């Protein structure tokens, strides 16, 4: 199939595709023109609600927009910027896990619950305890355990939640912590952890987080762990590597292996790594998608009716307005050794 724009009537982005009850549902961000100035922290992305679309034929069938399923005004703790989200099912309930900024300008993850995948979703009154940053991906493993992968740099604030250690003779002797006092979260002790100092490309790249969810899918059941992407020699990718993690975590499983895929941010690629369990480490494999039109790239990978698909977005319909993005889909294929064939955007 040729790449297909799924819903050209509106600007949707950051697609999280899931199969529920034999139908494919996509939970996107909802772009609009807020008039906010462009900045490196994503202030021009002022999304304020979520919709869900569904289809029974990905390649040619009708796409239904089920309307708004959650608005920022319904979320007591959130002020603005309803960024990426994902939905997972457990025991007949559907859990929307989303990212938004609170009234201190700090991103957290929240949960909203529905009886149907079409919503509407009712939000919890408080964000997930100890949550931070953006871009949650909710992954349900074969044993029923649910894991959430999350994190994004720059405007996604992931860099706030690492003690920045001295890693260079020119760096200060005492660690510098960029965390705001209003944003304090407990991600567990890490006294010897070295992380990325901006401008130090030989430091280990900042990883995303993964955490197993509680039985009610409303809280973390443990301290989040780092999702480490390593090279073929077993070494973590460096901050200066254009293939290192930046944002947009996604997890899927193929032939018993765990595929962690992500956006590289300022190098604008989708890349992936493979591991043997949900926590990793994950060994870097390659590029899934080269840069598209627009600054961000964000995706999901899902099997539906025997065919694998890559869902993503670009800014071609809006003439390269980076905060007005459009959903896109095309087929995805594996090689015999389990590696993913690079997808060519058209």
Describe the predicted segments one by one.
Residues 1-346:
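Carbohydrate-active catalytic/glycan-binding domains of CAZyme proteins
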């Amino acid at each position: 199939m040729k790449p297909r724009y799924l819903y050209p009537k509106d600007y949707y982005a950051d697609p999280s595709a899931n199969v529920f009850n034999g139908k494919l549902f996509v939970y996107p961000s909802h772009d609009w023109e807020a008039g906010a100035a462009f900045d490196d922290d994503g202030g021009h992305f002022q999304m304020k609600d979520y919709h869900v679309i569904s289809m029974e034929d990905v390649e040619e069938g009708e796409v239904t927009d089920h309307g708004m399923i959650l608005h920022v005004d319904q979320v007591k703790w959130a002020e603005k910027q309803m960024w990426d989200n994902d939905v997972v099912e457990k025991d007949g309930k559907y859990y929307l896990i989303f990212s938004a900024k609170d009234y201190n300008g700090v991103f957290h993850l929240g949960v909203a619950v529905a009886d149907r995948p079409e919503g509407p979703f009712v939000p919890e009154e408080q964000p997930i305890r100890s949550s931070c940053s953006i871009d949650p991906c909710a992954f349900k493993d074969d044993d029923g355990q649910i894991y959430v992968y999350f994190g994004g740099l720059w405007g996604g604030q992931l860099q706030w939640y690492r003690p920045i250690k001295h890693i260079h003779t020119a760096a200060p002797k005492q660690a510098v912590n960029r965390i705001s006092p209003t944003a304090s979260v407990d991600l567990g002790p890490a006294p010897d952890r070295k992380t990325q100092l901006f401008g130090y490309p030989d430091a280990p790249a900042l990883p995303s987080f993964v955490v197993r969810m509680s039985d009610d899918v409303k809280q973390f059941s443990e301290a989040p762990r780092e999702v480490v992407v390593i090279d073929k020699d077993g070494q973590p990718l460096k901050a200066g590597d254009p293939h290192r993690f930046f944002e947009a975590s996604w997890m899927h499983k193929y032939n018993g292996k765990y595929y962690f895929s992500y956006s590289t941010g300022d190098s604008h690629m989708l890349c992936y790594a493979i591991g043997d369990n949900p926590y990793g480490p994950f060994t870097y494999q390659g590029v899934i998608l080269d840069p598209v039109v627009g600054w961000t790239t964000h995706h999901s990978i899902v099997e539906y009716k025997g065919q694998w698909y890559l869902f993503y977005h670009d800014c071609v319909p809006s003439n390269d307005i980076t905060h007005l993005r459009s959903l896109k889909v095309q087929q995805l294929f594996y090689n015999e050794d389990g590696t993913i064939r690079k997808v060519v955007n058209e």
